[in-house]
């Protein structure tokens, strides 16, 4: 059973978690109705959808029984309900992508999926294949992807509402599988590297949600997609590569591939002169040593960094401001 609190003691995260617990616990009933009035619509709807999530796309057994939840509320809450539903269902897009194995989700298929989802949401889509990446000078993305039989892609999704006064650039790391390349990772738990594209999935889901919500802010998502493999043409430790924009870098460890693809993507995103640039990535296990597995480290311009961490906590995404020092 879910915990129950007095109304004045309940915050959004408590409601969200209680609704999620209910969605996971109530499995033997075909339908459930809950009455909220005008209270807690957003966190309850989000909790029910997110808490009831299961990745079942590849299971061989028959699907589990489902429960239908009906939220009874004031008629005036319809818009809030719809917004919460769109937001939560967009999160499920990211979850499904992260859970999809790399033999099915690789740069080409990932780009095709994003293109279809984005077009359905009314976004503009641009996909650069390996020939276009080479021609336009995306040396970081090419350096990471050249060891794989599955060539890299760069996906650009754009939301351009009329009269938008702000433009936000989103960048997300999209390494569909990371062996470490020539600097090979240990075998233990390497299977978890199917999720090394989580940053790009989050950013793709965010811009899709923005389009469906008709947000009045311009957004562009720049998503570098590559598979980091130790093939015969793979980048070697000691190689020097030229990034998009002309800056060079020396590769000392090919398992630092995220920085290479993101350098290209951030340089390209910066050409749009955004008011804000937000990048998210599964960059290093050292972050988990610092903050654990459930808290994201946020680095950047101090005021914006602190606001981003605060917003994350407000919506149930644990985040903590971290220093970004120059030495």
Segments from the language model and where they lie:
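A generic structural signal for tightly packed, nonpolar segments enriched in small/aliphatic residues
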Residues: 111-327
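Short amphipathic alpha-helical segment within the helicase RecA-like ATPase core
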Residues: 2-174
């Amino acid at each position: 059973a879910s915990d129950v609190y007095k109304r004045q003691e309940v915050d959004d995260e408590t409601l969200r978690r209680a609704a999620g617990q209910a969605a996971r616990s109530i499995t033997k009933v075909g339908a459930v109705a809950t009455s909220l009035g005008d209270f807690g619509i957003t966190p309850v709807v989000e909790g029910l959808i997110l808490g009831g999530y299961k990745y079942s796309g590849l299971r061989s057994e028959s699907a589990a029984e489902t429960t239908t939840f009906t939220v009874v509320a004031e008629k005036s809450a319809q818009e809030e309900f719809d917004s919460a539903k769109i937001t939560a269902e967009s999160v499920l897009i990211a979850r499904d992508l992260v859970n999809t194995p790399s033999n099915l989700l690789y740069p080409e298929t990932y780009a095709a999926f994003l293109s279809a989802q984005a077009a359905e949401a009314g976004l503009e889509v641009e996909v650069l294949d390996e020939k276009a990446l080479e021609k336009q000078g995306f040396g970081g993305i090419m350096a990471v992807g050249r060891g794989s039989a599955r060539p890299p892609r760069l996906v650009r999704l754009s939301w351009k509402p009329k009269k938008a006064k702000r433009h936000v650039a989103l960048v997300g790391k999209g390494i569909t599988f990371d062996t470490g390349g020539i600097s090979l990772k240990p075998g233990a738990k390497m299977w978890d590297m199917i999720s090394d594209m989580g940053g790009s999935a989050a950013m793709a889901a965010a811009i899709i949600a923005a389009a469906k919500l008709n947000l009045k802010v311009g957004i562009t998502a720049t998503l570098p997609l590559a598979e980091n493999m130790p093939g015969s043409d793979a980048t070697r430790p000691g190689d020097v590569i030229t990034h998009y924009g002309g800056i060079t870098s020396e590769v000392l460890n090919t398992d630092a591939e995220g920085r290479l693809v993101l350098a290209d993507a951030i340089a390209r995103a910066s050409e749009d002169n955004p008011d804000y640039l937000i990048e998210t990535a599964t960059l290093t296990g050292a972050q988990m040593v610092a903050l654990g597995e459930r808290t994201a480290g946020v680095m950047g311009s101090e005021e914006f960094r602190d606001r981003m961490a605060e917003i994350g906590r407000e919506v149930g995404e644990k985040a903590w401001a971290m220093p970004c020092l120059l030495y």
